[in-house]
Amino acid sequence: SGTIKILNNSIDFSLKSQNDKLRAKKIGIIYQDNNLLNDFTVIENVYLARLSLEENKEKAILDAKKLIKKLGLSNRENHLSSELSGGEMQRVAIARALINSPDIILADEPTGSLDMKNAKEVFKILLKLKNKNRLIIFATHNRFFANMADCKIELISGKIRKSTNARIR
């Protein structure tokens, strides 16, 4: 709980229903264990994340298809998410996080359950997003990926051990 300010909008996380739409529009979340709906298809997993904000189902589906294509999953859009590989599932999770065009993406160990090949693919996607003027905040235990960050904050037992200043690349 608490309050954060994003682009001159305050979001009070203790007022759940009042801020759900604003939070969904401004913040995309990528969970460590992807949080997909196993009995739903790839396309359903993505467009359902939009329906809370978009009443036009056809537009939500069209936008979801565009994202799925950008992430290289067009040939899997009608497969159940439970039929996907770990890397594919994480790309679907990224598409869900992006469907509302958020300004900020929070990623909790986005590569934690992936092999190195798929983990690098996911980070390539995240770096492309960063270059499109989105703020990406991610948690990782992997130093290789941590070193890709413009700014790092190292935590031990919930306390800041050290931090680095942001650098422009």
List where the protein language model places each region.
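Conserved signature/switch motifs of ABC ATPase nucleotide-binding domains
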Residues: A24, H79, N100, K132
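Conserved ABC transporter NBD signature motif
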Residues: G2-F13
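Catalytic Walker B motif of ABC-type/P-loop ATPase nucleotide-binding domains
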Residues: I105-D108
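ABC ATPase NBD coupling module
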Residues: I11-G28, N131
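Short coil-to-helix segment of the ABC ATPase nucleotide-binding domain corresponding to the Q-loop/switch region
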Residues: F40-L48
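Conserved ABC ATPase signature
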Residues: L80-L84, E88-Q90
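Hydrophobic anchor residue at the start of the ABC signature
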Residues: I94
